[in-house]
Amino acid sequence: MKVSEFDYELPPELIAQEPVEPRDASRLMVLHRKTQRIEHRIFREIIEYLEPGDLLVLNVSKVIPARLYARKKTGASIEILLIERLEEGIWKCLVRPGQKVKKGTELVIDEDLSAVCLGRGEDGTRILKFQPQDDRLIFEKGRTPLPPYIKNEVPLERYQTVYAKEEGSVAAPTAGLHFTPELIEKLKKKGVQFAEVVLHVGIGTFRPVKVEEVEKHKMHEEFYQVPKETVRKLRETRERGNRIVAVGTTTVRTLETIARLPEQEEYVGKTDLFIYPPFEFKLVDALVTNFHLPRSTLLMLVAAFAGKDFVMEAYREAVKRRYRFFSFGDAMLIL
């Protein structure tokens, strides 16, 4: 399958530059897979599509202030993006321009914080050891790691879901940005159940698909965790005959990863599961997601779930109706 099959025309002004206030006032496109029908709603109306006993599964990973600006002793500017914590104060990072940072290169962030390069990781990453080795201090100096298509500085809390709690992502699991505490409360009152997983969104989010054949693309590994209580709730939802509704593509990848493993009480590991058409979904019955970049692995996942032709038609409709796209954009519910 060709990557070009997942391309579409997007006027740049439809790329959302800031989030909607309140969060649940964004638009919601509802896709009915069985009837191939499309509806246009407001996100808070999602409650009308969920039944008592349905299970909403949230990725509670929290975005870290992963972007840092440093200088070499020569005065050259270097941008650092924290990717993965190896131990306290030692991180796998992306650095730009990379060719200027070799083993032994010292980087000064400010008078309180510096780093030295211990060597190269795979994928052109660098291993940096910070001085002092204090993650709290590193996070204090860091900024929101916004995607390159967002031009404005946005406070970290608006690039964070209201339920985020496990630090480790370098990009937000954006489908969750539409939920407010009030909407969650209303859903609970209706009898909708909630469960949590963790998948720390990693470097793959910033990396475009560079191959022409979809099947040749390799995903980066990302850490995930599914606690005992969630495993129990997933099983009980299945037994009741209710739906498992994944909030976000990261949640889908976590659930479909564990669906392919031997049964366990809880799950912790790394996944590089790449979902593209055709794909047999074993756990996920419905999906809440955003509008994704052309040719992206996220769009391929959505196409695998709802059917490529139907999804590409829905995207053309979204452009026509001036939906807002990408991280701060509108949402889609696929039933």
UniProtKB/Swiss-Prot annotation:
This is S-adenosylmethionine:tRNA ribosyltransferase-isomerase. Belongs to the QueA family. Its main location: cytoplasm. Monomer. The keyword Signal does not apply. It comes from the Bacteria. It is found in: Cytoplasm. It holds the Pfam family Queuosine_synth. Keywords: Cytoplasm, Queuosine biosynthesis, S-adenosyl-L-methionine, Transferase. Gene3D superfamilies: QueA-like.
